[in-house]
């Protein structure tokens, strides 16, 4: 495995990261590729004084994340798994081994990320404390959770996925959007992405933005819209709504979501109810294409009332911030009752336009 670390004015954090990788995971300098993306803190001179270090210097600085990673892969002819790191994410004991174990637990798993412990959190107040707690077994492992999107600053990518998905999209600039695109491409090719419940990294500082700015964010958003025909990529489940599903974990639920988007709510159900049968309806064909990798998804408009679920009835029908967009929400609810199992429930959330989070920005 090769570790690619992209740094911008993070010299001290980078030194800490390199030492932690050596001490806690046995990763030596020959397995590292350090990219200095225009730092002004002495990183370049330090790299040039270390003959055993693999590194790249972006003289002008502000190179796109996609171009950096693609160039590093090509320059060093990487033909193995890759761990992409931002220096603000510090390795904790056993995390690399646990991520690798999960990565190869199933051939369909293409990439994994650790759980993140944030600086100053109740779990561990600082990095030294976090290391001690892991070594003493005070931070318990959790369930592995399948994800739609992985963090751009700490992700392990399997060689087979890298080869099949190909290069990172060089039209995109910001790391988070580059990873957004790569995750979607991987999912559509049949790969699964996971957060490893037994691997932990510590976010010791906020990510440096370098010369990234709003212009790059707007440009990326426009390019993603053109490529995927989606205004945004929702990878955060509506846990407030989904918390009303209270059956035991092994219950073979049948769940339908109207307006399922890319399937993040249905994926939450899959993670918490592995025996559930999942169905979705989504009007956006691109979003449905992603959701189809998770559930049985129909592309269509629920208000046309021509759905055919093959006689299946559902324990739950979910409307997450959907009803307010319909011409006839009451009629649609009455129509969907036809597919509701006796004793089943409709779960719906409707945004409150008078909520302080909306009003304060007016």
Model-derived regions, located:
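A conserved acidic beta->alpha catalytic loop
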Residues: 36-44, 62, 260
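Glycine-rich, basic loop-to-helix element that forms the pyrophosphate-binding segment
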Residues: 59-76
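A recurrent flexible, glycine/aromatic-enriched loop bordering the glycosyltransferase active site
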Residues: 67, 136-157
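Short, well-formed alpha-helical segments that are part of the catalytic scaffolds
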Residues: 10-25
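Conserved donor NDP-sugar-binding/catalytic core segment of glycosyltransferases
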Residues: 90-126, 352
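A short, conserved alpha-helix in the catalytic core of glycosyltransferases
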Residues: 148-166, 171-199
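S-adenosyl-L-methionine-dependent methyltransferase catalytic module, highlighting the catalytic core
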Residues: 170, 327-362
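Short beta-strand-to-loop acidic/aromatic patch adjacent to the donor-nucleotide binding site
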Residues: 79-90
